[in-house]
Amino acid sequence: MYDNEAKFSLWCDFIERNFLQSEFNSLLENNIINGATSNPAIFKTAFASPAYKKIIETSNKRHPKDLYEILATQDIKITACKMLRNYANGDDGFVSIEVDPNLSDDTAATIEEGIRLYNLISMPNVMIKIPATKDEAMSTLMARGISVNATLIFSPDQVKNCLEAFKEGSKAYASRFIDTTMPKGVISVFVSRFDRKLDEVMAAKSLPTGQVGIMNAANIYHLIEDFGLENVRTLFASTGVKGGSLRGDYYVRELMYKNSINTAPLETIKEFIKEKAEAKNVPSKENISSFFQIIKNNEIDINVVYKDLLSDGLKQFVSAFDDIMKSL
């Protein structure tokens, strides 16, 4: 764990075969990271590297999705094995794999694929990653003892639905298995996309830039902590900086909250570890409320922003997944 006192974890939002055999080991051994996440966009980039060329060329014309799952689950299993000691010691050690984003509107298919991927990898420290559009899928997987990463979280309403789903799934699991380790849940709050979308508008209205994502994340953090599920934590995602005047590790340093996780791109992690960082105080609920009232007063409809970002995020994941299918 990066900061034991604050119970702040840093996870790596990148997986690639050669990286797993080299730099990943160093980050893990030096207690810089203690978890990892993946998504279709990450695998799209990874599979274009030379590490996979021979495997793809000798795949005997497998169906693209079958080949994708072979490559992805191999990488996830390698990652899970490397972090098994962390997991056994209660120091996170989780790695996430996402279900096919094309299934986001099909609860039954999402559940089926989540169970299948979990069984295929067959490691206790794997989290099944599900876009937060299907609450029943989250609760069903957790009830079966499968840890879940609820992703593409933008709005407080999404968070409330996720928390209820995790509560239901946890209760169902606990009723069947007494005195066993509870499956874990993380709620992946996307951060930087708010500012990439709104900074220009904010600047034009003489409002502070680089703040909407932070304040929204802080608001959601309060919701999760107040709900009080011991097996569920806040995970801050989309924390890389693309252009602009912000330093590369801005969204990691600003969101070092107690009992939280930040999953960051490799370049962001490299920037972050150059200088010592300390845990941050979370903005008060009153300050958060005042901030969003100012936004509302300036005719920025945050609810429309929530919907747009979720829609865009789903489209991006589907596009990346479909691009992988074409390339394989």
Spans of model-derived segments:
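N- or domain-start disorder-to-order transition segments that initiate the globular core
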Residues: 1-23
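Structural preference for beta-strand elements that scaffold enzyme active sites
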Residues: 7-11, 34-37, 92-96, 125-129, ...
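Catalytic beta/alpha-barrel core
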Residues: 13, 72, 124-133, 146-158
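Active-site-adjacent beta->alpha loops and helix N-cap segments on the catalytic face
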Residues: 21, 106-111, 130-145, 155-166
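Conserved, mostly hydrophobic/aromatic
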Residues: 39, 97, 128, 141, ...
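Active-site beta->alpha loop and helix N-cap motifs at the rims of alpha/beta catalytic domains
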Residues: 42-44, 50-137
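Catalytic alpha/beta core domains of metabolic enzymes, predominantly
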Residues: 135, 147-267
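Flexible, acidic glycine-rich loops studded with aromatic residues
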Residues: 230-327
